[in-house]
């Protein structure tokens, strides 16, 4: 994914970007009835990657697969996080038009509203308990030269590092693969414990915009803390009993690099229920 991502250099010569064709080499050898390739939205939407998309379609067709390429919003399927991913799906013996219709019709059955961050975190054991231990102790410090946008949560850079504040009464922004240390999202525990109270982050942002304070004058309250591994996993819809291994930084990265589990399950069920039952029943293109 990294070679195609807008977060990277997006170089056509990136060796990692060639792995999408290696994927189809594996398909050619194993001849599965269906396949699913997942990648970043940019591969499906940016003009610079159109030659790659064309090669994927042509190669899959030569291998006898009808295909469709779709971009899905995780929030449309009950995931409490704004995350979009591309899925390239193929099936033997079915036309591409039929693959597309089977997939899109099947997806409709799984659409569900997404919960807010508050709803998700409130269902977990309390922060700092054995069931939700502290996993990031990076101090929350104010940026010396903040960047201000209209919202404290969207676009504004108020704190040191890449960790952004979490808006509790909305879905989470995309959890980054670089989580860990001061790149870990920030939660205001007092606002989580007291619904309806104004977030200090919002007050600070407003005071900066109106010239009533500065980073030198403001004092960060002790209730600002970092998102835990358990909380990040819940926002990615991992099962509660899922075990992550490695250092805390590696655990955060495993979560940030993942496809939300509920979205992955949805795609898998659609392939199982809508495509596998039709493989070979129709004439391929």
Task: Give residue ranges: language-model regions.
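Short glycine/serine/threonine-biased micro-segments
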Residues: 1, 76, 254
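Short glycine-rich anion-binding loops that position phosphate/pyrophosphate groups of nucleotides
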Residues: 1-2, 40-42, 93-94, 180
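Short acidic/His/Gly/Ser-rich catalytic and metal-binding motifs that mark active-site loops
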Residues: 2-6, 244
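Short, solvent-exposed loop/turn and secondary-structure capping segments
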Residues: 5-8, 47, 100
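Short, histidine-centered active-site or binding-site loop motifs used for metal coordination
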Residues: 8, 39-41, 248
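Short glycine-enriched, charge-decorated loop/helix-capping segments at active-site entrances
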Residues: 8-14
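Conserved Class I SAM-dependent methyltransferase catalytic core
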Residues: 16-92
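S-adenosyl-L-methionine-dependent DNA methyltransferase catalytic core
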Residues: 59-62, 85-285
